[in-house]
């Protein structure tokens, strides 16, 4: 008698598998985490994406991740040069809502983070800057891992819903909303 369990098809989620294919491994590491909100913000810019959004003509997104809560804030950008305006908006909203100040900003030292106006704002606001080496993704692992999680999540969402890729910002917004309302091991 043949075992009926062996004849059942393997439940494989093809959109999940397709979205998790990567080029390089970003190692996970347990480091000490800051305990206060806004004590450390990780940031990274992703893009350009090969297709612009259906509304707004966006090609990039920038992430701001609070180290203590792992709360994600994401903004769409048309150009890399829009990153500073996105940071100013994030800083104003986060500091106002949490009644706290950003103490440290960690980024990958990309050109979008190195403008004179960005440096001046951080200096006058008392924000310490931490830059990683450009080729060492693991040094900015929180932001890099978040972007990787975004790519996997939105690819899965778009594939599962059979939506065209120009809906990527809608998927990023939805994915962020779901993440920020889900329990994490941090909390």
Tell me the role of every PLM-derived stretch:
Residues 1-187:
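Anionic group-binding determinants
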């Amino acid at each position: 008698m043949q075992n009926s369990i062996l004849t059942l098809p393997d439940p494989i989620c093809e959109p999940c598998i397709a979205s998790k294919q990567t080029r390089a491994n970003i190692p996970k590491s347990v480091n000490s985490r800051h305990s206060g909100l806004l004590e450390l913000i990780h940031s990274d810019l992703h893009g350009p994406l090969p297709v612009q959004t259906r509304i707004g003509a966006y090609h990039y997104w920038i992430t701001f991740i609070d180290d203590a809560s792992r709360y994600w804030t994401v903004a769409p950008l048309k150009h890399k040069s829009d990153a500073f305006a996105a940071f100013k908006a994030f800083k104003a909203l986060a500091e106002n809502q949490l009644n706290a100040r950003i103490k440290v900003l960690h980024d990958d030292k990309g050109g979008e983070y190195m403008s004179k106006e960005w440096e001046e704002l951080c200096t006058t606001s008392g924000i310490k800057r931490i830059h990683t080496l450009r080729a060492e993704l693991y040094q900015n692992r929180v932001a890099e891992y978040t972007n990787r999680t975004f790519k996997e999540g939105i690819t899965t969402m778009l594939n599962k819903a059979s939506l065209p890729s120009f809906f990527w910002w809608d998927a990023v917004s939805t994915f962020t909303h779901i993440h920020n309302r889900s329990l994490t091991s941090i909390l």
